[in-house]
Amino acid sequence: MIKNNVFSKAAITGLLLIAVSLWMMAAGKVATSEIWMPDGFKVPILALEFGSSVAEIQKIVISISANANANILFATQIDMLFAVIYSLFLFFALRAIYTITNLNQYKWLALLPILIMAADIAENFQIVNALGNFEINLWVLKIATWIKWLGLAVAFTAVGRFLITTGRYFDKVLALSTYVTIPLGVWAMFAHNGINEVFAMLFYLLFPLTIIYAWFPGVKKKG
């Protein structure tokens, strides 16, 4: 099955991505009831990523217990590895689409995950600084955060643009789901409430669905 699969590299990387994702979620699991977060936020790490000011970020960090801080810090460090793996997954997926379609736009879009990875790592460094009570650069955090999230939206929309051309129902549902990401991301960029988490959580759905597609694409390798 995997031998003739044009998405084989993405499929295998996807399994590693799932494993690291589960590790990261387990490591960062904390009781959130005592953590102060802005209205609409329920996930501490997302509240930190989308922090609107240094004072707000510091208020969140101060409310986090020492044990919870250690867990979130460890999960953030794992996220450095996670960023590399999901970027590889997207790179392999977009390269596979380029192989199938021979459209140059996918050849160049396959480079987008490199920018996303760099932004995610820069964002994580700022969060590590915040958790360690070191100085943070709010503009670096904001710019890196939105390059990452909007970059993911563009990457998945590009995948969706290919999937909409196939005949399978699953592919079309996945494609339509990716089309929501850019408008939702633009809305979230100018908001500071629950819509930020809805936007981020959408990718928790899109990644596993795209991994499933990578394993069962219905497209065989040529030659």
Predicted feature residues:
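Interfacial segments of alpha-helical transmembrane regions
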Residues: 94-95, 100-117
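Transmembrane alpha-helical segments in integral membrane proteins
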Residues: 80-99, 155-169
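Aromatic-anchored segments of alpha-helical transmembrane domains
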Residues: 19-23, 114-122, 179-190
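N-terminal signal-anchor transmembrane alpha helix
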Residues: 4-40
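Extracytosolic (periplasmic/ER-lumenal) interhelical loops and adjacent juxtamembrane/interface segments
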Residues: 30-73
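Interfacial helix-loop-helix junctions of multi-pass membrane proteins
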Residues: 125-140
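Membrane-interface loop-to-helix entry segments
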Residues: 73-88, 140-154
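Terminal transmembrane helical module of multi-pass membrane proteins
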Residues: 152-223
